[in-house]
Amino acid sequence: YMFHLMN
């Protein structure tokens, strides 16, 4: 989920 939020 972190990756998605960072994108």
From Swiss-Prot:
GO cellular component annotations, sorted alphabetically?
extracellular region
GO BP annotations of the record are: neuropeptide signaling pathway
A single Gene Ontology molecular function, please? opioid peptide activity
Q: Where is the signal peptide?
A: none
Q: Which domain of life is it from?
A: Eukaryota
- Which family would the database say this protein is a member of? Belongs to the frog skin active peptide (FSAP) family. Dermorphin subfamily.
Relate the protein's function as given in its record.
Has a very potent opiate-like activity. It has high affinity and selectivity for delta-type opioid receptors.
Q: What is this protein called?
A: Deltorphin-like peptide
Organism of derivation: Phyllomedusa burmeisteri
